[in-house]
Amino acid sequence: MSFSVDVLANIAIELQRGIGHQDRFQRLITTLRQVLECDASALLRYDSRQFIPLAIDGLAKDVLGRRFALEGHPRLEAIARAGDVVRFPADSELPDPYDGLIPGQESLKVHACVGLPLFAGQNLIGALTLDGMQPDQFDVFSNEELRLIAALAAGALSNALLIEQLESQNMLPGDAASFEAVKQTQMIGLSPGMTQLKKEIEIVAASDLNVLISGETGTGKELVAKAIHEASPRAVNPLVYLNCAALPESVAESELFGHVKGAFTGAISNRSGKFEMADNGTLFLDEIGELSLALQAKLLRVLQYGDIQRVGDDRSLRVDVRVLAATNRDLREEVLAGRFRADLFHRLSVFPLSVPPLRERGDDVILLAGYFCEQCRLRLGLSRVVLSAGARNLLQHYNFPGNVRELEHAIHRAVVLARATRSGDEVILEAQHFAFPEVTLPPPEVAAVPVVKQNLREATEAFQRETIRQALAQNHHNWAACARMLETDVANLHRLAKRLGLKD
């Protein structure tokens, strides 16, 4: 089989039709799956010796949340090391990273696999993977044809990554000679709430404003702080963390501002506080609402004037610190109740960010579950950890009062339980491996029995007509591709279409 000019043109057109990078990547993967007639396809980004899924088709949704480290996936490592098309034979001893991740076929192993490394110049930036359930599924495509596909995908991915770098560094196009990967904390999620949060992080990171991060316990406020710091001009300097809720009142001031020798019993030497440690960098104050009013007043002075005093010292020290604060309390209510200073609240909340709870993030719970499954797989040395359909359904209908942290612990516990109930190094998580209280699952949908208003011939023709229409739409009105999809002769398909009134 050879790719026609029309097929390549259709792929190029799909790359231009999307509004954003994510949409374009998804169009590319969906089109490739149709053209190559594979069971699953994926576009992966390469970063720090791991592949990060950007778009998938034919794979379980939790794949988008997984991070495939090369040391745990020998096939992906082989693709990363190769400079060309990689074909894995059906009897390859290297496990496929997608085994058990094709919906409806969790217990079956992937047979055919092709990997296409994607390059920008000499730099590996990603990969295309094609998987099928038949051993010889991709034998009809030559390496040259697959290289053409890889070139189109590499161009799209390279442009997207370069634009991302330019936007994050606020550079002019003429300032960038080549793409360089920018390490950033991975915030997993594609829900509207998380998409908006990521946009706001990009906006505020480039500034030097103080940020107040609010959200329920376990939503990931510390990850937000890390993402802001890593995308800021201060990223080369330290990010210092302090949990205000864990500070005894007797040592809180010393922890923040430091002390000199002899300032109090036990002060046997000079000691720098968190503000000094974070000089020219960022200080993250977690659970800021737990600070006493006296300490709030001293913190306010630092934010106003940029100087600190160590405990027991009359001298002031200048510091240049950006403060990111987080809380699970409603600080406006705390201000009204007199437990938090209004002036400090306004100083901190120059640019407030709100992290959505997991119950409001839709399918993000499945992406995060995939991420934690992959973490457990690596940590426990398992060959695969996958979610059954029942487990995914359960996770989507539990409200997670403990948010992402509760999900993480639930996945880890479920993996341990599932591993104990079966031999081998493959784990499939079932609903019974989770101990969620009072989860009400929706009743299974019962299809309504239609009232028969047609005779058998009319009903058959109506079904054939609709099936052909759908196949044509999926194959861009390519009759040959439609015939292959329906597993019929193209001439017979033309005759049937004429009889059904679909062709003149």
Swiss-Prot record:
It holds the Pfam family GAF. ATP binds at residues 215-222, 278-287. The modification 4-aspartylphosphate is found at residue 57. Residues 187-416 form the Sigma-54 factor interaction domain. Keywords: ATP-binding, DNA-binding, Nucleotide-binding, Phosphoprotein, Transcription, Transcription regulation. Coiled coil: none annotated. Pathway: Nitrogen metabolism; nitric oxide reduction. One of its GO terms (molecular function) is DNA binding. GO terms for biological process: phosphorelay signal transduction system. InterPro entries: AAA+_ATPase, GAF, GAF-like_dom_sf, Homeodomain-like_sf, NorR, P-loop_NTPase, Sigma_54_int, Sigma_54_int_dom_ATP-bd_1. Required for the expression of anaerobic nitric oxide (NO) reductase, acts as a transcriptional activator for at least the norVW operon. Activation also requires sigma-54. This is Anaerobic nitric oxide reductase transcription regulator NorR. It comes from Escherichia coli O81 (strain ED1a).
